[in-house]
Amino acid sequence: MEIENTRDSDSMRGSRVGFSGSLVSGKKSARFKDDESYVEITLDVRDDSVSVQNIKGADHEAALLASRLEKRPNNTLGSQLSFHLRQVSKELKRMTSSNKFQKIDRSKSGAARALRGLQFMNKNVGTEGWSEVESRFDQLAVNGMLTKSLFGQCIGMKESSEFAEELFDALARKRCITSPAVTKDELREFWEQITDTSFDARLQTFFDMVDKDADGRITQEEVKEIISLSASANKLSKIQDNSDEYAALIMEELDPGNVGYIELYNLETLLLQAPSHSMNLSTNSRVLSRMLSQKLKPTKERNPFKRCKRRLDYFIEDNWKRIWVMALWLSICAGLFTWKFIQYKRRAVFDVMGYCVSVAKGGAETTKFNMALVLLPVCRNTITWLRSRTKLGKIIPFDDNINFHKVIAFGIAVGVGLHAISHLTCDFPRLLHATDEEYEPMKPFFGDERPNNYWWFVKGTEGWTGVVMVVLMIIAYVLAQPWFRRNRLNLPSTIKKLTGFNAFWYSHHLFVIVYVLFIIHGYFLYLSKKWYKKTTWMYIAVPMILYACERLLRAFRSGYKAVKILKVAVYPGNVMAVHMSKPQGFKYTSGQYIFVNCSDVSSFQWHPFTISSAPGDDYLSMHIRTLGDWTSQLKTLFSKVCEPPTGDQSGLLRADVAKADYKPRLPKLLIDGPYGAPAQDYKKYDVVLLVGLGIGATPLISIVKDVLNNIKQQKNIEDGTKGSKRSPFATKRAYFYWVTREQGSFEWFKGVMDEVSENDQEGLIELHNYCTSVYEEGDARSALITMLQSIQQAKSGVDIVSGTRVKTHFARPNWRQVFKRVTINHPDQRIGVFYCGPQGLVGELRHLSQDFSHKTGTKFEFHKENF
């Protein structure tokens, strides 16, 4: 023990005493399991009192309890100090041995931490007032009594009616209420206890819920029942199935004496064991966090011109690549339209057809250009080569190739509209109603006899080709819309069969016919007779040849890239993992994708799937989620040859061809690729933030594995392993956030999670799993799951939800806090943010990337995978 005594030079009235030493000796308690845990306590000693001035140390609970020291008269410094140190030690022992529930006075920080772990009630309940509950009582009550079945709806917990009924029973038992209904006054008492935010009240409520017979003790059977209930409320089927095992685990932890029950103080001991991660933040991190919060506060610029200028500056900064590409495209379209418009304004036909013919020909010229340009963004091999082998990616947004393809398609629609409408509603009617004298200059183009009706124009080659093209374009455009392509509309079954990905796929191939008709239509022109003035073929010749070569290359390459299937796993959640042999010379980058064909399902359909294996692996793997007809049929084929699940793998089917004595007949797969994708740019960043939702984690898992392989490689170089060469790998830190709805989803990448945990000794890869089916930490319905998770993690290092060494968080991440933490850890750096998942989260992540980039020195560059 060390004692430090410092006295004020001007006055002898006060002094501070520092103590550093072990607060607990002898037998270890559940709260203080390490005899070598020390704390430093600084006491402020006055003439007639002693108070705690400062507490530092390894165990935050010592600080919590030491704050209870009362002010007492000071006889001598030595005796007073000794008395209070004994009091601290005595208090610690009392807290770990008492079997009576008492009110505990805690420091502000300790109470805040405890409440974060014990805010049992649904946040919707906590935010509502009694007036709302009373109003619902008046609506739901019958003869002034509210039944147990309506209790959850009344207090705002209607989504978990079963759990609400358990809460009702606990509150009723406490008050000796045996009726299955309560009055308004009794409900008011229930409400006051539910909304009491003190640590002790909520701990007591939780204890009462578990203690079914109200004897003040919890048996293993009662623990099992509440585990099963909590698991059911959180859709954790595996925990529910193993509730016996987990109940025994809790009893083993809290009932070391094997007396057969646990009491309230046992729960308190467990729940107040270790400070949370946020409590261990360094002082510098806290200061930075506060400063960052101030920076990120929205500031309202009063001057509207300055406000608009700032928004414009931010917009240009975030979208300059898109801006210059769009500006160039619009300029070319406008230039072509203007050139053709002026050209026809100077021709003799203008006197009869007027501005209509100029508009029609201007629209036709832009259509020629766009029909040529629309093929380039879908030349996948060319785009991949430009992205991977050149530096054009610094100025060209290759990530937006599909979006640009859609924009060009819209430009085609505008051009076709201008061309067709101007002809059909304006210049053709003018020609039909022209006098003989006015028609005279038109004879070289339309013949000696003036057309007498619309049918004359339609039956000609120029007419019927145009009509057929427009019809085919409309079909392809409509079926390509996400409402039809992803089957988002509730359509009758007969019509629904005509939509979906298959309809999109086949209708898009109608453009082969469209391009043939487009060339014919552009050759048989009314107003241009010389071949060199018929420029349609000149526009589209090179793009069509390039696209045709792409398709031939795909067909040739896929023909000899038949892969051997090594292993198949069909997981819960309609996900299937396929491990294949890697074709000779097949090179790829994490984040890229391949097209897959299975002739047993369809000889013509090719579907894209991201590669989930890392470039350094000796196999190829992909994870496929069954969402449509093709993937459903593929899963059915593989399921027939898979083995049934073992006892610890609920719903998991496997077919390990490499190890099996009997070689099952598996479907034959062809692959085409790899092709470039936004996620492959991760190597450009020292730090990456990877966000995946559900099956969207696939490309990001490949990145995580690649970063891990690079860590191993660099370690070999540092250890002097021969033959190792340093690769141009910039990524030094990765944050991976995976959000999924179902517990079974964690089976998909369980091996990768464990491998990272075992090999990443320096913590360069942070893995964060979130299960949204579990109520957020602090909710009553997940309280016991959180407790069980802590015990299991401490005992075996395995998370009970994911089954991996990575701890699972509940509900959804606070993305602003995620960005804030990365900003604090990496000031003034470029962070690559890569997202793959549904469209719903894109806006929030893009906004946060822009907001933090604008207001801090850390620059976040957002990349979205086309999902």
From Swiss-Prot:
One term under GO cellular component: plasma membrane
UniProt domain EF-hand: residue ranges: 198-233, 242-277
Activity regulation, short description: Inhibited by diphenylene iodinium (DPI).
Keyword set, alphabetical order: Calcium, Cell membrane, FAD, Flavoprotein, Membrane, Metal-binding, NADP, Oxidoreductase, Peroxidase, Phosphoprotein, Repeat, Transmembrane, Transmembrane helix
Biased composition (Basic and acidic residues): 1-13
Membrane topology: Multi-pass membrane protein
Disordered: annotated span: 1-20
Ligand binding (Ca(2+)): D211, D213, D215, R217, E222
Domain of life: Eukaryota
Known partners and oligomeric status: Monomer and homodimer.
Miscellaneous notes: K252a and staurosporine, two protein kinase inhibitors, completely block the RBOHB induction by fungal elicitor.
Protein name: Respiratory burst oxidase homolog protein B
